[in-house]
Amino acid sequence: MKWKKSLAGLSSYKPGKREEEVMAELGLTKITKLSSNENPLGTSKKVAAIQANSSVETEIYPDGWASSLRKEVADFYQLEEEELIFTAGVDELIELLTRVLLDTTTNTVMATPTFVQYRQNALIEGAEVREIPLLQDGEHDLEGMLNAIDEKTTIVWICNPNNPTGNYIELADIQAFLDRVPSDVLVVLDEAYIEYVTPQPEKHEKLVRTYKNLIITRTFSKIYGLASARVGYGIADKEIIRQLNIVRPPFNTTSIGQKLAIEAIKDQAFIGECRTSNANGIKQYEAFAKRFEKVKLYPANGNFVLIDLGIEAGTIFSYLEKNGYITRSGAALGFPTAVRITIGKEEDNSAVIALLEKLL
């Protein structure tokens, strides 16, 4: 086969082991997954009711325009429907963005470490990837990113809060950054975890009307608890949306996914409960970190914490796994002595912290 040359040296995404697989390997009767930043509280009861009672005509293609969901989200953010695009998770939106803007003659700028799919998709398109190291505290080096932009740059990526560090860039700093980015360079503001930020930032979706080179990406996979439904979306100027729709598959979000997302966004009381629970979980880890001088906890603003224990990441990961908790080794994230842990229920956070104390 005459494969694209850009695929040489790349590998496919390798998901973590399933809970059942880990239990069988280690002889455990229970295991808690804290590796994929899923919502430990599940999803809204309104969503659960739809799941229990919904009848989907599986032989009929879904609404390719996601009309009802589009109206619901547009009303929620007070946007025009043409300022939205819906995709099979943010992963697909990232793929579409790289497809329309990157090729072997272009480059893209991003932080490192950050969400791995930016780099992966850029390399698939054969583009040059310019990675700007995070600052010592895990913050984006925005000045360094600006300096990396040249006439061949087509996309700049900002993950906010950043995955895997959890750092959050204030809105004023984002706007100051946007003011200095050339108007023909797209800035992707990936806000997959924005609903977890406490206190919530002011509404800023309409920034896309001021900055025509901005797209804000969000998802129903995290705080809304619909990871398996695969519904993500982008907010941008109508012309950006028009171009993306040219390459978007015609039936890319499922009928059931659209229905569940509509109910999910309606139940903001549940979202508030999730945010409060998550904030309390972060406080548990902050209190733990304060008790040990060698422990570094990166600023947590998502539904996960990145903790550097000064111990080889694989050792931490294996230790927690043997004791019933699946986490994410920092070795795969650019932090060789750290582990990323999804904020769980209070009792799970307490149990993990107790295990880490024993390890130290």
From Swiss-Prot:
This is Histidinol-phosphate aminotransferase. Belongs to the class-II pyridoxal-phosphate-dependent aminotransferase family. Histidinol-phosphate aminotransferase subfamily. The modification N6-(pyridoxal phosphate)lysine is found at K222. InterPro entries: Aminotransferase_I/II_large, HisP_aminotrans, HistidinolP_aminotransfase, PyrdxlP-dep_Trfase, PyrdxlP-dep_Trfase_major, PyrdxlP-dep_Trfase_small. It catalyses: L-histidinol phosphate + 2-oxoglutarate = 3-(imidazol-4-yl)-2-oxopropyl phosphate + L-glutamate. GO terms for molecular function: histidinol-phosphate transaminase activity; pyridoxal phosphate binding. It comes from the Bacteria. Pfam families: Aminotran_1_2 (PF00155). Its EC number is 2.6.1.9. GO terms for biological process: L-histidine biosynthetic process. It comes from Listeria innocua serovar 6a (strain ATCC BAA-680 / CLIP 11262). Keywords: Amino-acid biosynthesis, Aminotransferase, Histidine biosynthesis, Pyridoxal phosphate, Transferase. CDD domains: AAT_like. The keyword Transmembrane does not apply. Pathway: Amino-acid biosynthesis; L-histidine biosynthesis; L-histidine from 5-phospho-alpha-D-ribose 1-diphosphate: step 7/9. Its cofactor is pyridoxal 5'-phosphate. Homodimer.
